Amino acid sequence: MNKAYATEIVNTWKYENEYAIYDYSNEAEHMLDEEAWGSGIFTILNQDGELVGELSIEFFDEEEEYTPYAEFDNREITNQRELWIGFGMRPDLIGQGRGAEFVMACAQYAIEHFQYSGEYVGLGVAVFNQRAIKAYEKAGFQVFERTVGTINGKEFECVHMRKKVRE
């Protein structure tokens, strides 16, 4: 991630209807956090070098405490925690049947980049976002928990999903 990509995402990626809660203008502080670039936030480019998505990576311990970016290089710490991914696809690419492939590529990159040897990769999604849930299920993720989450200050029923990546 760099300033040009982060600024483009924040200023121009707008989603329609109920998906507007995912607009990156609501995530400007996070996306423009230079400390996170290359450690917790990554750009996704296609073969032609065009920006097509973003990937956010986090690690959580059993108490669901977040691991600071400064500790991401410490394999001893990260491999004792669960890897969680979040991502966004450029709005004009959504709804074209590419979601499962996109999610699998994001998960694989996160695993390889951090040399993650944990058992699961997790993610969270609002229940109303059935389009995303179907893509995640196609990518091998399964619901393991229902919860209430907050997205841009609004509460939503959410599901946590995970995919087993190691035996």
Spans of features found by a protein language model:
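Solvent-exposed beta-strand sheet faces enriched in polar/charged residues
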Residues: E58, G122-G124, F144
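Conserved acetyl-CoA-binding loop-helix of GNAT-fold acetyltransferases
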Residues: M89, G95-A110, K134, K138
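Conserved acetyl-CoA-binding loop of GNAT-fold acetyltransferases
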Residues: Y136-R146
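Acidic/polar helix N-cap motif
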Residues: N2-Y5, N129
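Conserved beta-strand segments that form the floor/walls of ligand-binding pockets within enzyme
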Residues: W84, G88, G122-G124, H160
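Acetyl-CoA-dependent GNAT
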Residues: K3-A4, N11-I94, Y109-Y116, K164-R166
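Conserved beta-strand-loop-alpha-helix junction that forms the acyl-donor binding cleft
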Residues: S117-I133, G149-E155, R162
